[in-house]
């Protein structure tokens, strides 16, 4: 089982927000998550990203691989993720 840290789309039409979640790589985008780590609100001007750093580091230590989009979002918001 390959585990990924990726985005799960939520919200209404034309007003999306995303949860940063840990999922099996074969799961559908909006499928059941193993654990929620935080959120990303692209429409908001302030407080766009919130993530539980301890849980994120724990999952990275267990071998979870963040998606490219999650890496970009977190690096853009001063949370360094190694490539």
UniProtKB/Swiss-Prot annotation:
Pfam families: Ribosomal_S16 (PF00886). GO terms for biological process: translation. Keywords: Ribonucleoprotein, Ribosomal protein. One of its GO terms (molecular function) is structural constituent of ribosome. InterPro entries: Ribosomal_bS16, Ribosomal_bS16_CS, Ribosomal_bS16_dom_sf. It comes from the Bacteria. GO terms for cellular component: cytoplasm; small ribosomal subunit. Disulfide bonds: none annotated. HAMAP family: Ribosomal_bS16. NCBIfam families: S16 (TIGR00002). Belongs to the bacterial ribosomal protein bS16 family. This is Small ribosomal subunit protein bS16.
